[in-house]
Amino acid sequence: MTQESLLLLDRIDSDDSYASLRNDQEFWEPLARRALEELGLPVPPVLRVPGESTNPVLVGEPDPVIKLFGEHWCGPESLASESEAYAVLADAPVPVPRLLGRGELRPGTGAWPWPYLVMSRMTGTTWRSAMDGTTDRNALLALARELGRVLGRLHRVPLTGNTVLTPHSEVFPELLRERRAATVEDHRGWGYLSPRLLDRLEDWLPDVDTLLAGREPRFVHGDLHGTNIFVDLAATEVTGIVDFTDVYAGDSRYSLVQLHLNAFRGDREILAALLDGAQWKRTEDFARELLAFTFLHDFEVFEETPLDLSGFTDPEELAQFLWGPPDTAPGA
């Protein structure tokens, strides 16, 4: 790759320019090849952008994965979190990528250096592909139980990091406080829920300190959506969990929000199987607490949920509809 190609990075000088180029195959492929060459790693014949993502990601055939971090869209924070997560997970009993190397595309120039990580590629297919591609309900539920076991092991990983993933980190509770202050107006703008329900939400939502009281911090992956989990449905195996830019020392209940509403698409029978595999006791307040975490989550969590929620006016009924046992009547 020539110096001219590196200079193309100067085109990314704002959130808008980053957004328009972040998943551009033609733009990133030569840069990813340069990254592998600089690390002395084999350069595969094929590098492709697997789909839409927050950070530029290219996947090699058959290996590896290259992930680049810009200065926009929380890139510096994402790099710090992901780097810390890989250090913490290095010997953990969970299927995660191996970190093969790291570097910068243009170090020491005074401009943004464009750091990158190179990781091993996960085998299997994404959870989303497996769920969409099977009619074997029992196999899918068995896989959800296995995912629950893996999730339980992830939550028990010791918090040995130095910033975000430490037992006394305040990043997670501060995030929840910020979300509590903003969530009602955000949901008004997103439009998935009725104004009458949102009018009641401020009084219904618990105080963050009350919600977290007595909870031991755990390793929490906050973005377990349908393409961040890799599986082998036929073998009932979870083959990989990826993307550690949204990790916290926090409350394990938070990790269920994207998992259920995005990956499971709100299917409560699949959620019940996962909880069974994780040996997660469903308390009397489970649905109410999980709806609270739904509203405190950092993402637009209903975006991929194929459920019409607009008829609900009572948060308690919405809690049971989304998070109650699978035999609970909808109530809307």
Curated annotation (Swiss-Prot):
Q: Which UniProt keywords apply?
A: Antibiotic resistance, ATP-binding, Kinase, Nucleotide-binding, Transferase
Q: Which residues form the active site?
A: 223
Xref: InterPro entries? AGP_Transferase, Aminoglycoside_PTrfase, Hygromycin-B_Kinase, Kinase-like_dom_sf
The answer on whether this UniProt entry bears the keyword Lipoprotein reads no
Q: Which GO terms describe its biological process?
A: response to antibiotic
Q: Does the keyword Transcription regulation apply?
A: no
**Which GO terms label this protein's molecular function in UniProt?**
ATP binding; hygromycin-B 7''-O-phosphotransferase activity
Coiled-coil positions are none
Enzymatic reactions: hygromycin B + ATP = 7''-O-phosphohygromycin B + ADP + H(+)
The family assignment reads: Belongs to the aminoglycoside phosphotransferase family.
What is the protein's known function? Answer: The aminoglycoside phosphotransferases achieve inactivation of their antibiotic substrates by phosphorylation.
Name this polypeptide is given: Hygromycin-B 7''-O-kinase
Species name: Streptomyces hygroscopicus
